[in-house]
Amino acid sequence: MTTEAELSERLSEVEDPIIGEDIVSLGLVRDIQIDGDTATMSLAINSPFAPAEMEIGEQIRETVAEEGLEADLHANVDNIRGFDDEVFPNIRNVIAVASGKGGVGKTTVAANLAAGIDELGARVGLLDADIHGPNVPRILPIDEEPGVMAEQERMVPGVSDGVKIISMDFLTQNQDDPTIMRGPMVNNVMTNFLENVEWGTLDYLVVDLPPGTGDASLDLLQTLPVAGAVIVTTPQQMAVDDARKGLRLFEKHDTPVLGIVENMSTFHCSSCGETHDPFGSGGGEKIAEDYGVENLGALPIHEDYGADGTTDPVVKNEGSDVNDSAVELVESIADRIGEVNRRKAAGILDNTDSGTAFGEQPSGQAKLETKEPDGH
């Protein structure tokens, strides 16, 4: 009969597909116990349905099965986040989406990221923190309107095809009216969004930050247990310069930058058949190279990104010509979050990832799924 030590030795043959070292040496496999035909173990992973972590899980199950055992896997990531306050205690990963300036498609990226991770099978929320330009409900169709839990005086998010959403747009009577607020009022709204929303348990919360590096973004970074940030730019030099400022903001707050997304990268002309670079080229790639962060991908200019809140976002529109690039971007970001978490657990954070402020895992141990669940 296989012993725990022998099974651990076998599992050392399983390699983390991104970090490139075996999962036992990394310390990702913990508390192996064999009882009859079942091998139960804890894994220091925290990015549900990220492709790389799904692959790790499948390789573990195959290895355990070769020993005549059935694997019972649980996520145990008590030391991954390490953030002491109680903001979002039931949310595993907070992903900030930011830009150095407005008009680069930050909200489009945030909305498609949330919808795409939901499509992978995870439980996802989307916080529209851009108080003065709350456009998320105009991109994602709302199936269930937001509400209020009267007894607890807590807001209930709206829902778009499984994604829970909170936005200032829900609180305005006329969508054409500007949000006229000074700093203290904005802070009050954000405090309510952070403390008085019934998110439930989420695997990921995507936060659409305000553009720029002002007080609103600073306050959020000082309050939220952000696992990592995505910076959106266009190839245009002005946008690239401002994106650099945004990147430095996250560095100063010891928040891992998951990578750069270059939006409006190219335009394919259906008339002439040529692909053009209307805003130049290589801006996102250059920032990534200069700062040693990931170049997560480039999204083209395409009419399907002009969602008006009545149709599916590109990432869920399999008939779209640009669906593949959107899905690849989502998977890259999910994998990057997983990599940061596993490096944290293994104690091998590099300079890009060091000093991260993480919070406690909401459920301690969570049973790992083998396939996408039927519901969220």
Give the predicted meaning of each segment.
Residues M1-R30, I34, A71:
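N-proximal, solvent-exposed amphipathic alpha-helical segments enriched in charged/polar residues
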Residues V94-I131, L140, E151, L247, ...:
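Walker A/P-loop phosphate-binding motif and the immediately C-terminal alpha-helix
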Residues S25-A98, P373:
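Extreme N-terminal, non-catalytic leader segments
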Residues G147-A150, M168-D219:
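Switch II (G3) loop of P-loop NTPases
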Residues E4, L26, I45, G57-E58, ...:
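C-terminal lobe/tail of nucleotide-utilizing enzymes
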Residues L11, V29, I91, G102, ...:
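Residue-level signature of catalytic and energy-coupling elements of molecular machines
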Residues M190, E195-E198, S217-M238, A243:
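Inter-motif core of Ras-like GTPase G domains
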Residues G121-Q173, N187-N188, L194:
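Phosphate-binding loop that captures ATP/GTP phosphates
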